């Protein structure tokens, strides 16, 4: 009889030592339970202590699973669902952490400067009206045109019809005067020279009595 009592006390002592070593934050989980409103059930799995232990291991991050001494797995929450929930939560938290800095900075800048006024650090570009841009383009074009010397056109200008007529009339007068002055006097007619020679021969014959 005494050996059975000592054996049971030794077993309970090992249980409580294991309980103390594996439930360092048990008080935090038990704090979420409203002990006044809840009562122990009729079974071991429905006691307040058991519920607190299940809640404690379920909220561990990362989830390590339920210890075997806590009870049968069929009586405990689904470990696979708990792991999937934690993974989804971690991914969502990581994405929001990467997205939030840039989004919050843009949102902060827009809230501080809703009218697009350039900030003091010079990162925000200055807004330029469209009319000013067109005016600058026109001024640049005008200054470049005045600075560049105009090239003389190598293409000859075509004269008008009146100019061509006056030029052709002047050329015809010049050619007529040149022809008049440079044309040689035609020699005397050859037939008239022959007749004069015959007349001289006749007079000479008459003088000599032939």
UniProtKB/Swiss-Prot annotation:
Name by which UniProt lists this protein: Protein MSO1
Region entry Disordered, spans: 88-210
More about this protein: Present with 1380 molecules/cell in log phase SD medium.
Record keywords: Acetylation, Phosphoprotein, Protein transport, Transport
Highest taxon of the lineage: Eukaryota
UniProt keyword annotation of Magnesium present: no
Residue numbers bearing the Phosphoserine modification: 102
Pfam families in the cross-refs: Mso1_C, Mso1_Sec1_bdg
Modified residues (N-acetylmethionine): 1
Compositionally biased intervals (Polar residues): 117-141
Quaternary structure and partners: Interacts physically with SEC1.
Biased composition (Low complexity): 142-161, 172-183
Its job: Involved in secretion. Component of the secretory vesicle docking complex.
GO terms (BP aspect): ascospore-type prospore membrane formation; membrane fusion; protein transport; vesicle docking involved in exocytosis
Claim: NAD is one of the keywords in the record: no
Organism of provenance: Saccharomyces cerevisiae (strain ATCC 204508 / S288c)
One GO cellular component, as annotated: cellular bud neck
């Amino acid at each position: 009889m005494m050996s059975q009592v000592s054996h049971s006390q030794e077993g309970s002592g090992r249980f409580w030592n294991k309980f103390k070593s594996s439930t360092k934050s048990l008080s935090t989980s038990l704090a979420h339970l409203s002990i006044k409103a809840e009562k122990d059930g009729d079974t071991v799995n429905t006691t307040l202590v058991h519920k607190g232990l299940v809640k404690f291991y379920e909220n561990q991050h990362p989830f390590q699973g339920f210890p075997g001494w806590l009870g049968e797995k069929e009586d405990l929450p689904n470990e696979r669902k708990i792991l999937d929930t934690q993974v989804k939560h971690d991914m969502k938290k990581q994405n929001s952490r990467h997205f939030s800095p840039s989004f919050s900075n843009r949102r902060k800048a827009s809230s501080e400067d809703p009218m697009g006024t350039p900030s003091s650090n010079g990162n925000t570009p200055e807004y330029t009206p469209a009319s000013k841009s067109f005016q600058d383009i026109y001024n640049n074009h005008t200054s470049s045109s005045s600075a560049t010397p105009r090239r003389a056109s190598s293409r000859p200008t075509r004269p008008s019809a009146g100019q061509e007529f006056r030029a052709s009339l002047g050329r015809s007068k010049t050619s007529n005067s040149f022809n008049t002055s440079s044309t040689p006097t035609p020699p005397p007619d050859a037939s008239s020279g022959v007749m004069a020679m015959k007349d001289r021969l006749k007079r000479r014959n008459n003088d000599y009595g032939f």
